[in-house]
Amino acid sequence: DYPILADADRSVSDLYGMIHPNSLNNLTVRSVFIIDPNKKLRLQITYPASTGRNFAEILRVIDSLQLTDNYQVATPVNWQDGDDCVVVPSIPTDAAREKFPKGVTEVRPYLRLTPQPNR
């Protein structure tokens, strides 16, 4: 679950400096901020006015952040919910095999994959 904010009066946009002071009043802001429950900014994307936002990517990032906050994994390029994850390098391989009972595949000593832990 995550809240989505609409900023009809531009108060949040002004607070975070999202609008250039010389911009037109009617120009939409195409910025996305993901702020976690601890009020920490985790992602900021600003799109050109000519480019629409990619909501599939935004949802993918939220899924990744929620997963990696709860498990010692990272998500690789083009990862989708349900795909294998990367075991973080700080966990030794023996400990990783114990921590991830679904299995750990060692592609390289520095690259170990495991099925998504919360599936």
Residue ranges and their predicted role:
Residues D1-R119:
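Chalcogenol-based redox active-site neighborhoods
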